[in-house]
Amino acid sequence: MKLNKRSGFTLLEIIIVIIIVGVLASLALPRFFSTVEFSKSTESFAAMTAIRQSLERCYLAAGGNYTACALANMDIENPANSPGARFSYAINAASVTGYTIVATRNSADGGDSTSTITMIQTTAGVTRSGTGKYVGIK
């Protein structure tokens, strides 16, 4: 008597594997996309550092006062004007002793305009914070 030897996977085994892969993908993809978005914040860090250095040069040229310093009259090109820029930048609340630089994510590459990165310079030092997708930035 001959026995039929069947080889391969049953339909049930294939369905179970598909379900497991689907569950793993649903857990991993949101984390992947947030990591990709968070990595785009490095562009803003580099630009904010350049703006900060320009503000310090402006501070010295203005005789120790940040109020005369704005993106329009500084010695660097606005980083938002560079091709492929993902952020727009603003200098808010410039005072005699400090300033605030705000980088707002634009809609390029799937960004949203509600996510911001803020750098605050005071006599105590520099602090960074974020909103929206960048809430964990320090």
Language-model features, listed with the residues they occupy:
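Short amphipathic alpha-helical/adjacent loop interface patches that line ligand
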Residues: 5, 48, 52-55
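Periplasmic/extracellular, small/polar-rich flexible segments of pilin-like filament-forming proteins
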Residues: 56-138
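Conserved catalytic core of two-component sensor histidine kinases
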Residues: 18, 45, 52
